[in-house]
Amino acid sequence: ESIGELQQVAKETGATAIYWNRSFNPKIASRDAAMVENLRTSGFKTQSFRANLLLDPRAIETQQGRPYTVFTPFWKACLKQLNPPSPLPIPTSLIRPDKQPDTLDLHELHLEHQVDWTVGMRRAWAPGTSGANLNLKLFTRYALQEYDHQRDLPGVVGTSRLSPHLHFGEISPQQVWYAIAESGAAEWKNSQFITELGWREFAQHLLHHFPHTINEPLRAPF
């Protein structure tokens, strides 16, 4: 059980608080709620952050106090509220616990197969923050201005290639937002790329308010 393992690591390192980034996936949110209750009962301080989205899905609603179901009015409402905090600089140091928890080397888990099925991924992606920042830099410098039409051309590197980095938290949407803002692009808030970030926000908005959309359409006729 992940809760038990988390408690064990916290106890072994002498931690008194647990911090993490929220997920609005219904199943994960339910798991996290149970984890919070368990950890607080055990005496740990807990706090979560909205690091993977520009806005909390619970903060956007129609004038009738309901969640949005159509993208355009949703994104217009978001743009009126959006003022994401500036990204913090990379920390110069991290405090290590006096005692490291018992652990295994990755190779001891025997996760690698004899067939190297990851070779294609390694050629296409550079996992981690460095790879994410490089892709963002290359995109804003060389592809952003032509994104509207080059994104549909398979033979051209016309997209940001940031999707996996955003998914795994290797770069934040706040970093992307400010990079586009500082790129010098005209009317950047109304650009197609910023709108694509909006669709990402809208997907999480629907997932939070309409959890049945994991397996079913938002509207029954469809």
Residue ranges of each PLM-predicted region?
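Trp/Phe/Arg-rich N-terminal binding region typifying the photolyase-homology
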Residues: E1-P85, K189
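Glycine/tryptophan-enriched, flexible segments
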Residues: G65-P221
